[in-house]
Amino acid sequence: MAKRLLTAFYGGTFDPIHHGHLQPVIALAQLVNLKQVILLPNHIPLHRPLPKATPQQRLRMTRLAIADTPGKLFVIDERELRRNTPSWTVETFKVLRSEYGPMAPLGLIIGQDSLLTLPQWHRSQELFELCHILVCARPGYQYGIAGYKNNNWMEYRFTDDPSALNYQPAGLVYCAETPELAISASDIRGRVHAILPYYDLLTHSVHAYINKQGLYR
């Protein structure tokens, strides 16, 4: 197969979006030579409580965050935010695959923590027919293939060659050595509520927006 440009997607609640979301993905983009990462903020998350901020507020914070980020790496896709039901990743990628065509390399960005639970995801094996999995490191989680030595349908998918992601449309797992930032949205919300400093955990514009809107108080 000829080399094609990989398009990567990164979903989340982004309640609020912070450096722990953005900086590892920026590092991943440099390692994999991504020209664009498409953010997929969701409306109703799976397997976690409803967001504290409204969809409109979370979308605004996401726009502010990428405006504060140098370059034009990030863009936003609002399709999951417009849904009034939870968004299954495999269903979103079925639609994306139909839009991008059968041969375009597509990637889903997740954290090392999510990789551990990937075999339990809804129709996870079907997901590998639709996209690659690009994994960012997470604090406290062992890097890379550890834990999959006895998982036959996962182990053979791992590659340490990022260029391989451009030569097939889906099916590979690439674990990137990205910054491990111990930042979480729940910690930020807790800090806001407790009137503790948090300005260094997210971009300036998002910090200002949270204060102006009185979010998470």
Curated annotation (Swiss-Prot):
Transmembrane segments: none annotated. SUPFAM superfamilies: Nucleotidylyl transferase (SSF52374). InterPro entries: Cyt_trans-like, NadD/NMNAT, Rossmann-like_a/b/a_fold. It catalyses: nicotinate beta-D-ribonucleotide + ATP + H(+) = deamido-NAD(+) + diphosphate. Pathway: Cofactor biosynthesis; NAD(+) biosynthesis; deamido-NAD(+) from nicotinate D-ribonucleotide: step 1/1. Catalyzes the reversible adenylation of nicotinate mononucleotide (NaMN) to nicotinic acid adenine dinucleotide (NaAD). This is Probable nicotinate-nucleotide adenylyltransferase. It comes from Baumannia cicadellinicola subsp. Homalodisca coagulata. The gene is nadD.
